[in-house]
Amino acid sequence: KTTGLSTGMKQNGAITVASTKERMQELLRQATTAQLSDVEVEVLNKKRLKELYPVLHSEDIVGGVYMPKDAQADPVGVTNVLAKAAKMEGAKIFEKTPVKKILTKNSRIIGVETDKGIINCEYVVMATGMWSRQLGEEINVSVPLYPNEHFYIITEPIKNLPQNLPVLRDYNAC
């Protein structure tokens, strides 16, 4: 449902680069799979990479793929918008209320037991991050989520850096 609330989403696309022939072969397989699902993908040579990402040091890059419709959003902004939209529809949000147990009946969630008592409900949003998988196991629900470490850098503004650069991924550099 459209709420008119902004998530801060920016659709700048995404580039994944390959610095080995093996990684490039993997990217080509992934691009083919994406195209079978009607996802727009462009296979990139070094020249096209520099056009799309002019600040990229591309001497040791074999090639890459570009997905122009990929987007990014601020996770905190998305969380706040989802919470506000849910409240607009009558949902109640309980912060700082640890759940001890998810209550079920006939394979359906009927509520949660917290340290403040039982909360009966028709729906539960498990916003428990990396603990969601463990919580799901307790009620025989598979949550295909695994902890994964990500790296990013924070810098001062970089002069003349285009503001609409695609997200850049280099799995060989991590």
Labelled PLM ranges:
Residues K1-L52, A173-C174:
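Dinucleotide-binding Rossmann-like beta1-alpha1 core, especially the glycine-rich loop
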Residues A14-A18, G64-Y66, Y152:
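Short aromatic/hydrophobic contact patches that present stacked aromatics
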Residues E22-Q25, Y53-I61, L103-I110:
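A short, glycine/Asx- and small/polar-enriched loop/turn
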Residues Q30, V55-L56, E138-I139:
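Residue-level signal for well-ordered alpha-helical positions
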Residues G64-Y123, A127-W131:
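Helical element adjacent to the flavin cofactor pocket in flavoenzyme catalytic cores
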Residues I102-C174:
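Flavin-dependent oxidoreductases
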